[in-house]
Regions:
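N-terminal low-complexity, intrinsically disordered segments
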Residues: 1-61, 65-75, 139-151
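Acidic interaction surfaces
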Residues: 22, 26-29, 74, 136-220
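Generic solvent-exposed, charged/amphipathic alpha-helical segments
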Residues: 32-36, 89, 93, 161, ...
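Long protein-protein interaction modules used by eukaryotic assembly/scaffold proteins
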Residues: 13, 58-140
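A generic secondary-structure boundary signal that marks alpha-helix termini
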Residues: 40-41, 97, 173
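Aromatic-residue detector
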Residues: 2, 55-59, 115-127, 131-134, ...
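Residues in intrinsically disordered, low-complexity segments of regulatory proteins
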Residues: 8, 56, 98-101, 137, ...
């Protein structure tokens, strides 16, 4: 999404839409705030303006999608909100040290902390809502027409998926963990599938699984 981040300039490329971000804005914080605001109020539409020192382009963010367009060309390039957040958060986390120097007069450590806090405010509620929707949809599909032992098996799975969701809501993991889980199409189903093959409590396996995933990433 972002590249060549240096001296208050960065290139932007998403879904074939190309633009430039300049020192006139703080693109990461502006986009973060727009995503936070449109989650808190799903009727809201926020437009983030990017000034290339001459021409302008825009990100229009809603609770469902993100559109990119230019001042002189109103034709939009559209993405789902979820896909935009996945790429945006992964991208910013990867290059957070570069973004911390976007405005040289600011303390890089303080800027990193601010960015991480804003990314958390985006990803955590989005992840929890995604898991809640996943669980709701799963129940609506799985519980239809079940009888006898099938109901018991379904109730068993439901109990542990609900426990996994409760753990995600209450246990503090690092930002990278929340981003990693948000990138899964069905986070609860993914976690439940791993838990089924392990002899451990739901909490233990969730934590152990996350640590193992992190170790594999470091080895790569």
């Amino acid at each position: 999404m972002f590249s060549n981040i240096k001296n208050g300039w960065a290139d932007f490329d998403f879904k074939g839409f190309k633009g430039v971000c300049s020192y006139i804005q703080d693109p990461v914080k502006d986009i973060c705030q727009a995503l936070i605001n449109t989650f808190e109020d799903n009727s809201k539409e926020v437009v983030v303006e990017m000034d290339e020192e001459g021409s302008k382009w825009f990100l229009k963010i809603t609770s469902n999608d993100v559109c990119m367009y230019r001042e002189e060309n109103p034709k939009e390039v559209k993405s789902s909100r979820e896909n935009f957040i996945k790429e945006f958060t992964n991208d910013v986390c990867r290059d957070i040290e570069l973004w911390s120097k976007w405005e040289p007069e600011n303390d890089p450590k303080s800027v990193c902390d601010d960015i991480e806090s804003m990314l958390y405010d985006i990803v955590f509620p989005e992840l929890i809502e995604k898991c809640q929707d996943e669980l709701k949809n799963w129940k609506e599909i799985q519980l239809k027409g079940l009888k006898g032992e099938e109901i018991f098996k379904c109730a068993y799975e439901l109990t542990y998926k609900e426990e996994l969701l409760a753990i995600l809501e209450s246990v503090d993991f690092d930002l990278g963990t929340y981003i990693w889980l948000f990138n899964k199409d069905l986070p609860l189903d993914y976690l439940y599938g791993i838990w089924l093959h392990c002899d451990a409590s739901v909490t233990d396996i969730l934590i152990d699984m996350i640590l193992e995933e992190k170790r594999m990433e470091l080895d790569d």
